[in-house]
Amino acid sequence: MTLVVTADDLGLSPGVTKGILESHRRGVVRSTSLIVTADSSAEAAAQARMEPDLEVGLHIDLVGGWPVSDPAAVRSLVDSDGRFLGLAELTKRLFSGRVRAGELAAEIRAQATLARSWGILPLAWDSHRHVHLMPPVARVVGRVAREEGVRWIRRARAPRTWSGPKQSALRAATFVSALAFRGIPGNRWYVDITSERPRLDAAGVALLAAFGGLGEIGAHPGYVDERLRAADTLVDERMTDLEVLTDPLLRTAFGTEAVRWRVP
């Protein structure tokens, strides 16, 4: 059994960073993804560098806050104030052909470059709100990832036993984006404990293992603070994730060999 437990949103707020690092030190998290567009991102990167057993990837952000690039250079990605568009508006622009691929590529490269400038080598990529799976974005992400030497891109294909509109949409997006990511390794299946709340005890972990292949469990642990409330709609659920991921019984259920890094 090989399961990867990844905590998203490192750097989104000081409280989120604290929760992720605690989930690593006391729990089953061995992988996290850094969002570089928040005010607390640089400090989060510095703290993560002090954890030698924590793999830090890039959490591409195209829907929150300000771009790393000069807003004037990525006009198709931002609103009149120079901020990223929300998910709904970005989706409309993407599927109406109003987002320039060159601007997408420039912003993604800028985010990876900024992470490296903070001492983080992000060889595993995923994204905020799974936007990297949207076909127009996936094509650009796949091309830039190859140029950057990325060794892992998250797929979000839910196991068939998980059903619902969100799971079906992510399964379809993963299928459509497969060609864009061809040749870049990734997980076979993905479960988000924040939204799906699978049973995570010995029996639940055994059920996940039965799906076979390399699976990824995504989570969003964190402590609630004002920066988080201002930046994201996912707030109180993060405390629940923190409790789940640091439960000693869960660590026992996983076993030391079950929780592996994504990037060899």
What label would you give each PLM region?
Residues 1-4, 10, 14-124, 134-264:
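Terminal accessory/targeting
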Residues 127-129:
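Active-site histidine-anchored catalytic micro-motif
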